[in-house]
Amino acid sequence: MPPETATNPKDARHDGWQTLKRFLPYLWPADNAVLRRRVVGAILMVLLGKATTLALPFAYKKAVDAMTLGGGAQPALTVALAFVLAYALGRFSGVLFDNLRNIVFERVGQDATRHLAENVFARLHKLSLRFHLARRTGEVTKVIERGTKSIDTMLYFLLFNIAPTVIELTAVIVIFWLNFGLGLVTATILAVIAYVWTTRTITEWRTHLREKMNRLDGQALARAVDSLLNYETVKYFGAESREEARYASAARAYADAAVKSENSLGLLNIAQALIVNLLMAGAMAWTVYGWSQGKLTVGDLVFVNTYLTQLFRPLDMLGMVYRTIRQGLIDMAEMFRLIDTHIEVADVPNAPALVVNRPSVTFDNVVFGYDRDREILHGLSFEVAAGSRVAIVGPSGAGKSTIARLLFRFYDPWEGRILIDGQDIAHVTQTSLRAALGIVPQDSVLFNDTIGYNIAYGRDGASRAEVDAAAKGAAIADFIARLPQGYDTEVGERGLKLSGGEKQRVAIARTLVKNPPILLFDEATSALDTRTEQDILSTMRAVASHRTTISIAHRLSTIADSDTILVLDQGRLAEQGSHLDLLRRDGLYAEMWARQAAESAEVSEAAE
């Protein structure tokens, strides 16, 4: 499992060995013997496949020697045919073992990648709201997407391309040493070293060229999209020629970079072919010379040629393999960087669950700000009695919505305490805390699923009867009944297929399914028209019965019947009392009420 605090790796982005070391437990899980057996089985298939491949040139050599030395006699023909059949069987066996290896290992690779992705996803849900507000959602999901896609390919190349090639190279060196001596061994080793060094050097250069090409491609696309999105502005100012020139400049830069990238590939292919063919020509010339001296046979020529061809065939892809492994390690490291991200708001060790008998809420001298250089709440203190209806109002920026975020413990206050039923919320589990709270926000976001799913989301395992009861309580049951598909009606992405009032009723029903003792309405009607607002307010009043309710509001008319109204001003409690008490004081609340009443009167006069 991922650590609860960051491990502060030196540099996960570039430390490939450290990244592989961290991934090893996913590939060799201590708690899954079946997957470990699959890994062993895949390795066994690799070894059997490579052993078969290494045996093929021997069969090829024996068949050729039988044909050239036997003079067509029946025994020689029989031997030659036998080795030809052995060669064919060996090739089939090589393909068989390779595919069996893939079949055996596929589950290992997929499970390892899945478990890593699951750990990253779980970690993301543990991170604070600050992290998610600071990072783009698409950026985070892209890290997971790239990581899961590249890990599988990287593992394939590491385990089934690089490792078998190293095994084959070692075996070829031993075979050449035993059969032909030091000269051919030295030439082969030097050629492989030159091949690998050249491929790595040119591939590094090509990677930089490719990155530049991709960056310029993005710039060209961005300029085109920006220009077309601002079509009217371009026309207003007659700037078509300027836009065309800007796009042409970006497209030209991209084309130049693309040409360099493709030319570099040609250079890589030429360099690789030069090294391989120099070795092949030298090795075969040396073998032909040995044949002319009577030391070697025609079969030895075929033997050497076949081994070198088999050896360099996987090396032909070395450039792509190197890039893929390099990118895979970077993508995997990015996933580990997410896992290593510090959890800002965490449960204290052995934290108990919150037990709510009397759902009171207390803010005790709370000091908080989203940034250390900007304090939002300045020693805020107030108490919400169990079963009461309390409203929080104030000018924009007074810290009203911050109270809801602190109560849900999306952030911890710098100083002071927040208590529910006398228990400090920082000392109880976050799961139990949030189970005691329900919220209907200003913009209720729904999942891209059915109405039934969104209502039942309030509590895991909610029954259909509970969903029906919640829909009736939120006064949306009749609307659902009129829909052709009823509860199975899709709401669309973020609930866009529903009106604002319908979305709010679904959100209220979802909260009713949760059935928390404390309810928060965070400007739940501010985005609705007046008629819909009144309907929703009636529903909210019914829902709030027998619960502790905190309503954060901008329009004062929606909370005038609250038991207590808290008036915030610049992060401090300026006033508190009932609606009539606050009007009699003629303070900030009375000023806000008079201003909103005047604005409402102006709107009414304009409508008439």
UniProtKB/Swiss-Prot annotation:
GO terms for cellular component: plasma membrane. Residues 39-327 form the ABC transmembrane type-1 domain. GO terms for biological process: monoatomic ion transport; response to mercury ion. Residues 1-38, 106-154, 203-266, 323-608 are cytoplasmic. It is found in: Cell inner membrane. Residues 61-82, 179, 286-300 are periplasmic. Residues 361-595 form the ABC transporter domain. SUPFAM superfamilies: ABC transporter transmembrane region (SSF90123), P-loop containing nucleoside triphosphate hydrolases (SSF52540). Pfam families: ABC_membrane (PF00664), ABC_tran (PF00005). It is an enzyme of class 7 (translocase). InterPro entries: AAA+_ATPase (IPR003593), ABC1_TM_dom (IPR011527), ABC1_TM_sf (IPR036640), ABC_transporter-like_ATP-bd (IPR003439), ABC_transporter-like_CS (IPR017871), P-loop_NTPase (IPR027417), Type_1_exporter (IPR039421). It is a multi-pass membrane protein. Its EC number is 7.-.-.-. ATP binds at residues 370, 394-405. Changing residue 272 to A: Abolishes glutathione-dependent ATP hydrolysis. It comes from the Bacteria. One of its GO terms (molecular function) is ATP hydrolysis activity. PANTHER family: ATP-BINDING CASSETTE SUB-FAMILY B, ATP-BINDING CASSETTE SUB-FAMILY B MEMBER 6. Homodimer. Belongs to the ABC transporter superfamily. ABCB family. Heavy Metal importer (TC 3.A.1.210) subfamily. Mediates the ATP-dependent export of glutathione-conjugated substrates, such as heavy metal-glutathione conjugates. ATP hydrolysis is stimulated by glutathione binding. Protects cells against toxic heavy metal ions, such as silver and mercury ions. May also mediate the transport of glutathione-conjugated aromatic hydrocarbons, such as dinitrobenzene. This is ATM1-type heavy metal exporter. It comes from Novosphingobium aromaticivorans (strain ATCC 700278 / DSM 12444 / CCUG 56034 / CIP 105152 / NBRC 16084 / F199). The gene is atm1.
